[in-house]
Amino acid sequence: MSYYFKNLKPDLNSDVEEDDGNLLESIMANKSKREIDEQESSDDELKTLSFGSLKKAETVIDEEDFKDTKPVHKKPITTTYREESFDEDEDSEDQSDEDAGFFEEDSEDETHHGQKVPKKKSKHAPVEQSSKKRVPRVRNIPGLEIPRNKRSNLYRDIRFDKSTGKALDSSIIRKRYQFLDEYREKEIDELQKLLQDRKFLSKIDQGEREEMEQRLKSMKSRLQSMKNKDLEREILKEYENDMNKNNNTRYHLKKSEKRKVVQKWKFDHMKTKQREKVMERKRKKRLGKEFKQFEFHNRR
C-alpha cells in the first residue's frame, strides 16, 4: 500500500462540509444583525421627526400621485333622431306602416354643446323647443322695446317709461319734485365757495377746475330754465282764469297764443334798459329780413 493511501482519513469530506455550513451561518447571522441595527436606527430617526413634517411629507406624496394619475373625461353620448324613407315591399308583413321611420343613431356633428338639435320635418314646420328649457328673466315685450338711438343710455327715468303707464303731465311731475330745488341751490352755493377758495384751487389742476366751472354753469342754467317754465305756467294759468271768468265753457289757448301772452307779460315787466336791448335786437332782425328781399340778392 502506498504512502498516499496511508495518509487518507475517512472523515475528511465531512469536515469540509461542516466548515462551509458554519461559515454560511455566520454570514446569515451578521446580515440579520445588520438589518436589525438599520431598522432600529430608522425607527430612532422617525421618532425624532415632528408631526408637522410628517404631514407635509404626506401631502407632497399625495400631490405627486394626483399629478401622475390624469383624469379621464368621458365624452357624453347623445342620440339624435334622423328621418329616413324606405320603399314598401309587397310581400312584407307590415304593409300598413308608413313610408318613413325614425331610427336612433349616435352623431357628434349634429349636436351642439351636448344638447339635442331638433330637426324640422319640413322647412315650413314650426320650430320645436323643449318644455324643460327655462324662460329667460329679460324678455322683449312688444311695445316696450328700447329704440336703437337710446340703447346707449343705461339708466332711464322711470317716470317717463312706457311700462309704468301713461305719461303724466310735466306740471304734475314738477309739483311733486319741486322740493329738489333747495338741494340744487345748496349744491350750487357749495360749488361756488370751492371755486372761490384759493387753498382748494392750489391743490387741484387746471383740468379739474375747468370741469367744476362747466358743471356749475350747467347746474345754474338747468335751474333757471325750470324756474322760467314755472313762471310761464303761472302766467298762462292766471290769463286763462281771467278769460274764463264769465264763460260757461272753458276756453284754452293755442301754442302760438300762449307764446304771445308770455312775451307780452315779460316785455311789460322789463326794465327800461332791457326793453331798449330787446327793441334793438328786433329792429336788426327785421332789417336783415328786408335786406334779403332786395332784387340784387335774387340774381344768379
UniProtKB/Swiss-Prot annotation:
Claim: Nucleus is one of the keywords in the record: yes
Superkingdom of source: Eukaryota
Region (Disordered): 33-146
GO cellular component: 90S preribosome; nucleolus
Cystine crosslinks: none
Matching InterPro entries: RRP36
UniProt-listed Pfam families: RRP36
UniProt biased composition (Basic residues): 114-124
Subunit composition and interactions: Associates with 90S and pre-40S pre-ribosomal particles. Interacts with CKA1, CKA2, CKB1, CKB2, PWP2, UTP15, UTP17 and UTP22.
Protein name: rRNA biogenesis protein RRP36
Lineage, highest ranks first: Eukaryota, Fungi, Dikarya, Ascomycota, Saccharomycotina
